[in-house]
């Protein structure tokens, strides 16, 4: 079986987060940087996370449950209905999820979007910071940047914040297919320098949702930080 993934819920308050205790990996990045496309590429489902050319589309924490070895159906359990992915797991289904290495990808609101009010930006910042600092199920953070452009001030601030709070993280530079391969080293060097990735051993993965470049590297990092399991990527 291949990877199975399902949208579970959108949360605008901590009380709405899933309570089944499965590990979580958060995705942070500026608006329209390609977080949704990255999620879809990881699970090989272009329709899972809604993509848009309009920045600021994601205005909540979107939780996607990922079954890396395919979704099992415990013996005696009825076939789930189309809305089963939206409910909290319990009983045999939760046990099967834990045994199979299921986890959540959490798509967070993009930072740096100018077309919202200052009050809305503060509310998003409060929600994101509260999640990243207090969520016990969080295993790591994928910071997404655009390979085509130097990091923004918000990218640098987020990197420093992640480093300050010692959160396990991986920086992923998306849209590698949008520039020529010969330009990759130069663009990679700029991003690494601006984000301070050169001297402390923090990796930077080049990624393309179109070609699959970097997909295995991101999965490898997720495996190392969620738990040990093997699966058909």
UniProtKB/Swiss-Prot annotation:
Keyword Cell division: yes
Chain positions recorded as Mg(2+) binding sites: 36, 58
Top-level taxon of the source organism: Bacteria
Entry binding sites for GTP: 29-36, 56-60, 107-110, 174-177, 207-209
Example GO BP: division septum assembly
One term under GO cellular component: cytosol
Domain annotation EngB-type G: ranges: 21-228
Keywords for this protein: Cell cycle, Cell division, GTP-binding, Magnesium, Metal-binding, Nucleotide-binding, Septation
Keyword ATP-binding: no
Gene3D superfamilies: P-loop containing nucleotide triphosphate hydrolases
Matching PROSITE patterns: G_ENGB
Any one GO molecular-function label of the UniProt entry: metal ion binding
Regions of compositional bias (Basic and acidic residues) in chain numbering: 72-85
Cystine bridges: none
Cofactor: Mg(2+)
HAMAP family listed in its UniProt record: GTPase_EngB (MF_00321)
Family per record: Belongs to the TRAFAC class TrmE-Era-EngA-EngB-Septin-like GTPase superfamily. EngB GTPase family.
Function description: Necessary for normal cell division and for the maintenance of normal septation.
Protein name stated in the entry: Probable GTP-binding protein EngB
Gene of this entry: engB
């Amino acid at each position: 079986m291949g990877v199975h993934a399902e949208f579970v819920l959108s949360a605008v308050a901590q009380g709405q987060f899933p309570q089944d205790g499965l590990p979580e990996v958060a995705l942070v990045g500026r608006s329209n940087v390609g977080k949704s496309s990255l999620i879809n590429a990881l699970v090989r489902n272009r329709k899972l996370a809604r993509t848009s050319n309009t920045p600021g589309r994601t205005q909540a924490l979107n939780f996607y449950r990922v079954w890396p070895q395919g979704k099992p159906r415990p013996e005696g359990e009825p076939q789930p209905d189309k809305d089963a992915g939206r409910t909290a797991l319990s009983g045999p289904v939760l046990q099967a999820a834990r045994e199979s290495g299921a986890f959540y990808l959490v798509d967070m609101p993009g930072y740096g979007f100018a077309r919202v009010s200052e009050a809305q930006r503060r509310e998003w910042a409060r929600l994101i910071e509260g999640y990243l600092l207090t969520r016990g199920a969080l295993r790591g953070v994928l910071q997404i940047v655009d390979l085509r452009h130097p990091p923004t001030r918000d990218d640098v601030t987020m990197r420093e914040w992640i480093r300050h709070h010692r959160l396990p993280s991986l920086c992923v530079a998306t849209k590698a297919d949008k520039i020529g391969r010969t330009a990759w080293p130069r663009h990679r060097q700029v991003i690494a320098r601006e984000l301070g990735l050169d001297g402390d051993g923090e990796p930077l993965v080049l990624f393309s949702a179109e070609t699959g470049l970097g997909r295995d590297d991101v999965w490898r990092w997720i495996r190392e930080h969620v738990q040990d399991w093997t699966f058909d990527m």
